[in-house]
């Protein structure tokens, strides 16, 4: 009997240790935007559709109103390429503090433990990576040592010109390229600014072709 009690105690201890080793990450709330909620200001019909996943965390500076408004304001910047956001889901996660910051090894763990559809934009409290960027895009070409983060964007609280920054980083992911442009007022200039919103036909064509090939954009019916 004593041996059985000892074995049972050991089993309980091992189980408890295993449970505590797996961080508690759970979705606590979600919001949805349909195509009808997102502005389409272009005069020509959209050719490609984009579905986005947006992630915020409890107990951070980010709120749903800010992130959803930035997503709506970003939509016209993609429209010039014939790309329409056909759906966007914002999920709020409850997670241990370390996951609320962008740090490559920890964020890789988060992506493994709580996978979401891609492309995905994570709104975090700050970045702990060095050098530090307000926002960082990880495509497939630059995710070789961090495959869990492919097709994701990480945005720190306080990022300026948020809708422009989101469109800029999303374009990096869709085009699967870190290239920047020297053209005046181009969205892909190295520094984002309110006036940097334009894209050329050739930029749009490259982005659409790559994103469609990678399954991030879908052709819309005529």
Residue ranges and their predicted role:
Residues 5-13:
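Bacterial N-terminal signal peptides
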Residues 15-17:
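Sec/Tat signal peptide C-region and signal peptidase I cleavage site
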Residues 19-119, 123-128, 220:
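Propeptide-to-catalytic entry region of secreted or membrane-anchored zinc metalloproteases
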Residues 66-73, 106, 162-166, 170, ...:
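Stable alpha-helical elements in mature extracytoplasmic
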Residues 109-115, 127-149:
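Catalytic zinc-binding patch centered on the HExxH motif and its immediate surroundings
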Residues 148-167:
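Short pre-active-site segment immediately N-terminal to the catalytic Zn-binding motif
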Residues 170-185:
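Catalytic Zn2+-binding segment of zinc metalloproteases
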């Amino acid at each position: 009997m004593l041996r059985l009690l000892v074995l049972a105690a050991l089993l309980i201890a091992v189980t408890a240790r295993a449970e505590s080793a797996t961080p508690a990450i759970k979705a606590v709330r979600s919001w949805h935007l349909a195509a009808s909620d997102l502005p389409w200001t272009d005069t020509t019909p959209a050719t490609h559709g984009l579905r986005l996943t947006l992630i915020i965390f409890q107990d951070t500076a980010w709120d749903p109103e800010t992130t959803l408004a930035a997503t709506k304001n970003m939509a016209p910047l993609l429209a010039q390429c014939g790309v329409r956001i056909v759906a966007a889901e914002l999920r709020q996660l409850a997670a241990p503090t370390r996951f609320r910051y962008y740090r490559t090894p920890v964020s890789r763990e988060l992506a493994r433990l709580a996978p979401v559809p891609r492309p995905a934009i994570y709104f975090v409290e700050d970045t702990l990576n060095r050098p530090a960027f307000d926002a960082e895009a990880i495509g497939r070409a630059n995710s070789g040592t961090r495959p869990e983060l492919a097709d994701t964007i990480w945005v720190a609280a306080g990022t300026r010109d948020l809708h422009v920054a989101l469109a800029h980083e999303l374009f990096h992911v869709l085009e699967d390229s870190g290239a920047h442009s020297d053209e005046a007022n181009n969205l892909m200039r190295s520094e984002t600014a309110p006036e940097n919103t334009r894209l050329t036909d050739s930029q749009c064509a490259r982005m659409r072709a790559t994103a469609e090939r990678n399954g991030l954009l879908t052709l819309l019916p005529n």
